[in-house]
Amino acid sequence: MTLYAILFCIALLIGMAVSVYAFGTGSKRAKIFKEIYYSIEEVDGIGVIYTKTSEYSATLRFKNPCQKYCANIDGYYEYAHLMTALAQTLGEGYAMHKQDVFTRKGFSEDDGQQRESLSDAYFRYFNGREYTDGYTYLTITQENKKSKLMSYDPKKWNNFLSKLRKVKDRLRDAGIEAKWLDKQEATDLVDRYFTLNFSDKVFSMNNLKVDDERINMGDKWAKVYSLIDIDSATVPGLIRPYTDIEVNNTSMPVDMMSIVDSIPDAETVVFNQMIYIPNQKKELSRLETKKNRHSSMPSPSNLIAVEDIKRVQDVIARENKQLVYTHYNLVVACKKDVDPQKPTNHIENVFSRIGIHISKKAYNQLELFVNSFPGNCYAMSDEYDRFLTLGDAAACLMYKERLQQSEDTPLKIYYTDRQGVPVAIDITGKEGANKLTDNSNFFCLGPSGSGKSFHMNSVVRQLHEANTDVVMVDTGTSYEGLCEYLGGESIPYTEE
């Protein structure tokens, strides 16, 4: 009898295993990643992403125009106006999904160049030092009206390709060099977002364990912070593209969202910024309906709501502004041993300083993470994940800065940046891709013992390694030994 019972249990377990293998567990979460993409194909050098809900998407890679700590107020406004112009260019039925990625990595200078011993020693000193690197992607998505029957519309497809060309032309006219990701690059971006690994050349995927607070993946965990709670829109009534910080008792303008690139203990941060362009007439009609509903029930809160709606209607009528739906979230990945409360407290504190209170209701962690995949932004719930605002305000909440990186120039002089890693700078200002002057003369001034000779020896050595002729004029004989070592000619000044 015991043998029959054991055989029965074994048969039952085998049957359950076969059932799960064949039909799945019935859980939507188990299949959620299979329901995102249909395929990624290359069209005229552009990697076009097709979702299973029949949306088309393509992704641009570029660098934000404002360098960090540039204190360029005009640059912040120009970039915000550019994003607003892109939304107006795309028009109804399109979405912009901008992703700014920040990842911690170890410094490694492996360009394969042959260097002298001093230069090799210089780079060996910095090898392995951690710093933050940044990447910017902009995904353009065409919405597909949800229906049970999916069909190909050549008119919509041609309109999509036309909009892609217009977006790139608009960026080029603004002085931003952008490149469409091809099929391989788009696939790599999707895979790296899934693993939240943007630093390693070779990476692997792990199983996910999800709860209401975070997503566990391998040796790290990730948490999605939704910036705006639509039930209590705790954002400033008036915003601008920058904010002021105090530096040595002096006010300095920085990007309003500059706080997202310096979250403590974070290995990877992805700042998702989504803008959806709806039908303007329908949204204005809904606003009018809301205004009438509020005005029909007199109360202080309803009167304030009526005044706000009237103000928005006036701005739209006078300045031809655009209404958009937006969603912003931060995906923060940390190592397993990091206390989740530490980055959470930091994010809540820094955003509260600019009048934004992080949503406390982001319990749908997996859905927020999946809906932030490139090209999948229309999966965001239009009931509780998006909020309505003006296009200008939405652009102000976008990240506009880029981290310090080496200049594109054949004449590289290395200095360390604020993170303590070497970056190449063309101190002449005339050899790089961005030419600032046609005069390569420069002057080094400082009191005795301030390090002029140490600095100039390093600069001249690097110029010499770049096969550059150097003429130096010095009040003393500090560089006589250097001149002799490099085989140059020293001409001392005499009264005769």
Task: Cite the ranges covered by each PLM segment.
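Extended, folded cores of ATP/NTP-driven motor/assembly subunits in large transport
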Residues: L3-E401
